């Protein structure tokens, strides 16, 4: 009897499967989805430090939306943030119920939702440096879901600037002029606060655009308490006499050109550095331009001249050999109190800047990434407490510029005998 059942079994095996299985397979294709989620705009989306940005995200229905009985309530909207391999929830909303993560409290909103169930755009304000990353918009409606993602880049950097000869050398008027001279502008209180929220710390009082003097502290300690009673925050001296002398907090944002490292075989003096850049259809870069390039990802473990006579280099991926364990624009000072630019006859590489519309006339010289570091003694990343006379600014520290002392007797940084 067994042979009589064999054809029947084969026929059953070859017969089409249940319709439900075919529906499942078809449901996996994007063509069968009820809707698609799309983020508009050219990636990466650009925001500015301390500013606001709206990430436009819309739901496009591919067939008429289901009736009220087909689904319960409004679509579920979820925004997430991805950076450094980690994912964090920004907010989750369904109808009038919205849950916002603590890190984004009072900073995010869905301006159109739920009045519009197809516009789930995210408004993000008080932008910080660590808001740069991938944002994902996900919508779930009934059994259907769809998502889209976009990269966001928050541009703009706040940095402390001081004269090479002395600390606290700028009146309010001279502070504004100094920032403009180095290709930047004086920072606003909002920009300094946004930088602080992104992790910036500097125990040095500096002018801001509203004629106040402030400084950001992450780790309260002796001589860096200010008016915060031992708590982290931005210390504020309030409105200060414009003739008083302090450092400055400058702000740089747009590069609008190409910044490159020039590395001639024998290095160059400051005067030779200017000529070197001109020969290549460029000019010697300003400090503000170097900070903007670093903010855009420039990483060079090689000290170079800048237009103000300072010698600096940008580090994105830190190492002990390249100035310690913190990223930033490293500055070479002659003296332990973090003053004194190198002698103009010392020899270093040079950072040049070429406008966007200016073609290259001569290829840039190439050199190892660590050229010139043989003569630099790297300091530790521990923030240094440096005290000044009490009459300058009572009980305040002057520490923690990214800096390394230099030695004038050999290697890549050389002075004539």
From Swiss-Prot:
InterPro entries: C-type_lectin-like/link_sf, CTDL_fold, Hyaluronan_bind_Proteoglycan, Ig-like_dom, Ig-like_dom_sf, Ig-like_fold, Ig/MHC_CS, Ig_sub. This is Brevican core protein. Residues 1-22 form the signal peptide. The keyword Glycoprotein applies. Transmembrane segments: none annotated. Belongs to the aggrecan/versican proteoglycan family. GO terms for cellular component: extracellular space; perineuronal net; synapse. GO terms for biological process: cell adhesion; central nervous system development; skeletal system development. SUPFAM superfamilies: C-type lectin-like, Immunoglobulin.
């Amino acid at each position: 009897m067994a042979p009589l059942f064999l054809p029947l079994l084969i026929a059953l095996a070859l017969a089409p499967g249940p319709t439900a299985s075919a529906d499942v397979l078809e449901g996996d294709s994007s063509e069968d989805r009820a809707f698609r989620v799309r983020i508009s705009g050219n990636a990466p989306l650009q925001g500015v430090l301390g500013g606001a940005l709206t990430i436009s995200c819309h739901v496009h229905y591919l067939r008429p939306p289901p009736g009220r009985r087909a689904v319960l309530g409004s679509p579920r909207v979820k925004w997430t943030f991805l950076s450094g391999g980690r994912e964090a929830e920004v907010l989750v909303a369904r109808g009038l119920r919205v849950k916002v993560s603590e890190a984004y409290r009072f900073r995010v909103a869905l301006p159109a939702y739920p009045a519009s169930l197809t516009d789930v755009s995210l408004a993000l304000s008080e932008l910080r440096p660590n808001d740069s990353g991938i944002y994902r918009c996900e919508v779930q409606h009934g059994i259907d879901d769809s998502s889209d993602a976009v990269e966001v880049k928050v541009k703009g950097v706040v940095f402390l600037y001081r004269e090479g000869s002395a600390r606290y050398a700028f009146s309010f008027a001279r502070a504004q002029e100094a920032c403009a001279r180095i290709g930047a502008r004086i920072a606003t209180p909002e920009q300094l606060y946004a930088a602080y929220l992104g992790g910036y710390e500097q125990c040095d009082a500096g002018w801001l655009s509203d004629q106040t003097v402030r400084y950001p502290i992450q780790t309260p300690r002796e001589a860096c308490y200010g008016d915060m009673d031992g708590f982290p925050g931005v210390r504020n001296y309030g409105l200060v006499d414009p003739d008083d002398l302090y450092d400055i907090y400058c702000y740089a944002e747009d590069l609008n050109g190409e910044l490159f490292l020039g590395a001639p075989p024998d290095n160059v003096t400051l005067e030779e550095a200017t000529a070197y850049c001109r020969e290549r259809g460029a000019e010697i870069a300003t400090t503000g331009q170097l900070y903007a390039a670093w903010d855009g990802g420039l990483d060079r473990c090689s000290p170079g001249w800048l237009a103000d006579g300072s010698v600096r280099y940008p580090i994105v991926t830190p190492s002990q050999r390249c100035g310690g364990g913190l990223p930033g624009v490293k500055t070479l000072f002659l003296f332990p109190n973090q003053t004194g630019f190198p002698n103009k006859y010392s020899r270093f590489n040079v950072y040049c800047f070429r406008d966007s519309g200016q073609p290259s006339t001569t290829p840039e010289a190439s050199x190892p990434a660590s050229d010139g570091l043989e003569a630099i003694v790297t300091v530790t990343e521990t923030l240094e407490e440096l005290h000044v006379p009490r009459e300058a600014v009572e009980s305040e520290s002057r520490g923690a510029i990214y800096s390394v002392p230099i030695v004038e007797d050999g290697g890549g940084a050389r002075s004539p005998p």
